[in-house]
Amino acid sequence: MAITHYQMASFQSSFHFCMLRKTLRQKSSLHFAKRCEATNKIFQTHGSVAIYQKTLWTHDLIDGLETDFLINRKEKVNELEVNVARMFMDYENGDISNLELLELIDNIERLGLGHRFQTNMKRVLDKIATVNENSLGLKEEEEEEEEEEDNLHALSLKFRILRQSGYRVSQDFQRKFKESRGGLTGGLKELLSIYEASYLSLEGEPDLHEAKLFATEKLLKLTGHENEAMKDHVNHALDIPLYRRMLRLEARWYIDAYGKRKDANKQLLELAILDFNIVQSAHKRDLQEVSKWWEKTGLVRKLDFIRDRLMECFFWSVGMVFEPQYYTCRVELTKIATLITTIDDIYDVYGSLNELKVFTHAVKRWDINAVENMPEYLQLGFLALYNTINEMGYETLSAQGINIIPNLARVWGELLEAFLVEAEWTHNNYMPTFKDYLDNAWRSVSGMVLLTHGYFLMNQDVKDDAIESLENFHDLFKWSSMLFRLYNDLAALADEIDKDKSPNAISCYMYEHSVSEEVAREHVKTLIDKAWMKMIEARIACSEHMTDPLIDMAINLARVSSCMYQYGDGIKDPEARTKDRVMSIIIKPFDTSEIP
């Protein structure tokens, strides 16, 4: 029954893709109109008019990127990988301490090499997690030799790595953490370890909050230190804590920083540099593939009011899932992100309220016949969405025998319902309560759409009860989406926070509580910290049911949100920092001339 149903959907998808191309040709000279409900006037939007700045990354530029870095490097990479893997065997043979192992794992993850050593790391972390925590994870013969500062560093590092890996850290462990704080001396390694560990706290752990305040205060005093290396590390940590950083950006920065260390492991560093370039080359190939798709849709040429943000959307998908083996997930998530951006622009800046209602209901019903009642620009948007999702569904059905289209269509319908609520608020000049706003806004930010598609794209063994399985991870996805929303709203410029414009978290809080913008922003920052705690708890709860790549994808959504909205809206108005970040992780490779 499911196969018969999908064959019909697949046929419709093929037919209506042809319809989309025909419509694009017919509408080559189309001028779009935006209705102003208040005055009943029609404003013409011509192709020469652009609401948003043009893309910095053209299709021709992307198509010309070099992608052949791996040639003649496989043998060297394999040799280095084997040598690094031996370090884990050294630990299991008793040749290195727990502290040395934890520092190795920390370096591997920060250098972007975690995807190569997942099995090795899980095996030894399982062992460490079962060690009597009263020993602080140190071998008995080492305890007398380790200085207090090193013990505190080891304690913090162990806590952070175990918790970020999904292990439950006992209350007894935290009690020892509290007792050890009395021996804090303020050394940089110790302070940084305490600081980074404190950002893995859960609700009801005030001792870690106090440790965060202490370490932050001490680190702030070192920001003007004459030692440039020390100052760089301190400023980097205070900018965004490690657990909240986008993984590829951290890898790029840490490879440079690690290379300046006198104690750097040369083989580990060489592997990190080669691996970064190899992964980057894979990303370039993915980007070229999705760029051809985006060019083929013709949406940018025909809908002159939308943002052309393919590169930024690809950057976003790399932030969510960078590992080379998940190339299909990365490419398809980029398509989803560009469609979300396109449809968001339709709801935000172009469509009339009545037209948006028609579009929303059509998507909720997944009804291709509804296009007959739409204006041309909505037909283009609907058909692009319909064909793309049906094609994804076809690939999953072909490979695994499961029809996921109803699941994907459902989350799209829910997203557009949330879009419509916001459009109605704006149309009616209505300012919702802060609670009502957030209840809708964590859905309208599109995190659930991205994560649901990612779930099916990454999951190689989709079952008939996939939708029920998704519900088990609702909290993880919800808090990741909430962080996405809060970071987005925090990026709003002062002149955008206006009661007469679309509500956001800051304007709603200001209006409801009669407070200043500064007070509202501080409240949102507090909610961000609480949401991270909620998400970490949800991550731990999911560890027993969900594979690590899926959990990581949800956490990475929050991380890339933190990055893209750090200096403003990096999607709406890409500026110099966004361009530099794209260059650093997608375009510009490391120099490997000194690696034999």
UniProtKB/Swiss-Prot annotation:
SUPFAM superfamilies: Terpenoid cyclases/Protein prenyltransferases (SSF48239), Terpenoid synthases (SSF48576). A motif (DDXXD motif) lies at residues 344-348. Keywords: Chloroplast, Lyase, Magnesium, Manganese, Metal-binding, Plastid, Transit peptide. Binds 3 Mg(2+) or Mn(2+) ions per subunit. GO terms for biological process: diterpenoid biosynthetic process. (2E)-geranyl diphosphate binds at R307, D344, D348, R485, N488. Its cofactor is Mg(2+); Mn(2+). The keyword Metal-binding applies. Mg(2+) 1 binds at D344, D348. It catalyses: (2E)-geranyl diphosphate = (E)-beta-ocimene + diphosphate. Mg(2+) 2 binds at D344, D348. GO terms for cellular component: chloroplast. Its EC number is 4.2.3.106. Highly expressed in leaves, stems and disk florets. Detected in roots. GO terms for molecular function: (E)-beta-ocimene synthase activity; magnesium ion binding; terpene synthase activity. InterPro entries: Isoprenoid_synthase_dom_sf, Terpene_cyclase-like_1_C, Terpene_cyclase_plant_C1, Terpene_synth_N, Terpene_synth_N_sf, Terpene_synthase-like, Terpene_synthase_metal-bd, Terpenoid_cyclase/PrenylTrfase. Monoterpene synthase involved in the biosynthesis of (E)-beta-ocimene as the major product and trace amounts of (Z)-beta-ocimene. Can only accept geranyl diphosphate as substrate. Belongs to the terpene synthase family. Tpsb subfamily. PANTHER family: OS04G0344100 PROTEIN-RELATED (PTHR31225), TERPENE SYNTHASE 12-RELATED (PTHR31225:SF252). This is (E)-beta-ocimene synthase, chloroplastic.
